[in-house]
Curated annotation (Swiss-Prot):
PANTHER family: SOX TRANSCRIPTION FACTOR, TRANSCRIPTION FACTOR SOX-14-RELATED. Disruption phenotype: Embryonic lethal whereby embryos arrest at the three-fold stage of embryogenesis. Embryos initially develop normally until the late comma stage where a delay in the elongation process culminates in severe morphological defects. RNAi-mediated knockdown results in 98% egg-laying defective mutants with muscles lacking the egg-laying muscle specific protein egl-15. In addition, mutants also exhibit a multiple vulvae phenotype with animals having two or three vulvae. Double knockdown with let-381, sys-1, hlh-1 or fozi-1 results in no sex myoblast production. InterPro entries: HMG_box_dom, HMG_box_dom_sf, SRY-related_HMG-box_TF-like. Residues 93-161 bind DNA. One of its GO terms (cellular component) is nucleus. Pfam families: HMG_box. Residues 158-218, 321-359 are annotated as: Disordered. This is Transcription factor sem-2. It comes from Caenorhabditis elegans. It comes from the Eukaryota. Keywords: Developmental protein, DNA-binding, Nucleus, Transcription.
Length: 404
């Protein structure tokens, strides 16, 4: 073979003569090949060992790709984004990839190439089970790659701190609930430094309010007792306004049992006249006298007090009303109707007593007719006794006492 001429395969390939290498190109190529044969053998042996170590998974080439990228751009501003080929987002910073994520990234792509119809959840299950089945020696290269990516992530995001995002809760209708603000209660509990003592006192727990409520309840109970005791010492003038009501006939023993006798009308008519005479006792000489203050202080109505309750030392004498009332015809009608059991009761109910202004006994002398005298005899019967006793109230009642 003539070395001065170029080989025929170069001319056959259409290469121009001026682009052909010089004549001694073959010797130079042989010399370079002989000098670099040792280094080439060492490099090839290392690459073969690495390929044999990562032969069980297809991600070994990807890990090598990360290393080549790091060697190509050692002083990059975004080393993590360049190593992972991901876009940098200003809204959310992703966490650095761990060993499982480094391994599963290429493994997932491999599964998707062979089974494109497999669901993503099923792929994740298979990846998890296969990762757990690997030994620590098989996981070691991926753990080292994850540590290198973590350092790159720290250089790119020095102020990063992992904060897990909570999934928003869903309402029963399927809508998302608005997340609550956790800082609002803390601001209410802790007032600012420049706040006044009054503002801080308002934001304390409600223990003071509970104690005030208990004190207020105790105060109410004491107040009721004081009011009750104060009512016992009220003056007589405050208790004087008394409005008697007509009691039912069944409250007294002499009330009729049946309404056939017609005594109900007579009874209430007599009560009306008694109140009318008591209010005008100063203008009428024969009107009945009022009761003393003793019965009123005890809280007894005029109808409930007896005729003899005022007899005693220091009290005004009580007198029976002996003047003929304006219901004489009604009384006579009730007496003649056959209800003899109610005659004495109706006559005794006509009698009332009250002290006059001068405290002097005033007797009515209205017995001008025979009918009035008969009524007087019925109202004031004769009392018979066997002992000679001086009764100071005999003149006051106007009763004739016979001593046998």
């Amino acid at each position: 073979m003539d070395l001065q001429k170029p080989p025929n395969f170069m001319l056959d390939c259409g290469m121009a003569p001026h682009m052909m290498p010089p004549i001694n190109w073959a010797a130079a190529a042989i010399a370079v090949a002989s000098s670099t044969s040792g280094a080439t053998n060492a490099t090839s042996s290392n690459s073969v060992a690495t390929s044999q170590q990562l032969q069980h998974h297809p991600y070994g080439t990807a890990a090598g790709g990360y290393k080549h990228a790091q060697q190509a751009i050692p002083k990059s501003v975004t080393p993590y984004s360049d190593a992972t080929n991901c876009k940098k987002s200003s809204n959310h910073i992703k966490r650095p990839m761990n060993a499982f994520m480094v391994w599963s990234q290429m493994e997932r792509r491999k599964i998707c190439e062979h089974q494109p119809d497999m669901h993503n959840a099923e792929i994740s299950k298979q990846l998890g089970s296969r990762w757990r089945s690997l030994t620590d020696e098989e996981k070691a290269p991926f753990v080292a790659e994850a540590e290198r990516l973590r350092v790159c992530h720290m250089q790119e995001y020095p102020d990063y701190k992992y904060k897990p995002r909570k999934k928003p809760k869903k309402n029963p209708d399927g809508t998302l609930q608005q997340p609550a603000q956790p800082q609002a209660p803390q601001q209410q509990q802790a007032p600012p430094r420049g706040a006044s003592p009054q503002a801080r006192q308002r934001k304390r727990p409600n223990t003071d309010q509970q104690s005030e409520t208990q004190q207020f309840q105790n105060f109410k109970s004491v107040k009721v007792e004081q009011d009750w005791m104060g009512n016992a010492h009220m003056s007589h003038a405050q208790k004087m306004p008394f409005h008697p009501s007509y009691p039912s006939p069944s409250e007294f023993g002499h009330a009729p049992l049946t309404p056939e006798s017609g005594f109900y009308d007579d009874y209430f008519t007599q009560q009306h006249h008694q109140q009318h005479f008591a209010s005008q006792h100063h203008n009428s000489a024969g009107s009945p006298l009022r009761m003393t203050n003793l019965g009123m202080d005890m809280g007894m109505p005029p109808q409930m007090m007896g005729h003899n309750s005022g007899f005693g030392a220091g009290n005004h004498p009580f007198y029976l009303h002996t003047s003929p009332p304006s219901v004489d015809q009604d009384d006579m009608r009730s007496l003649s109707s056959g209800s003899s059991g109610y005659a004495d009761c109706s006559a005794s109910e006509q009698s009332t007593s009250s002290p006059n202004s001068a405290g002097v006994v005033t007797m009515a002398t209205a017995a001008t007719t025979t009918t009035h005298l008969d009524d007087l005899e019925q109202i004031c019967p004769t009392v018979t006794t066997g002992e000679l006793v001086n009764y100071p109230w005999s003149d006051a009642l106007g009763i004739d006492i016979n001593f046998s």
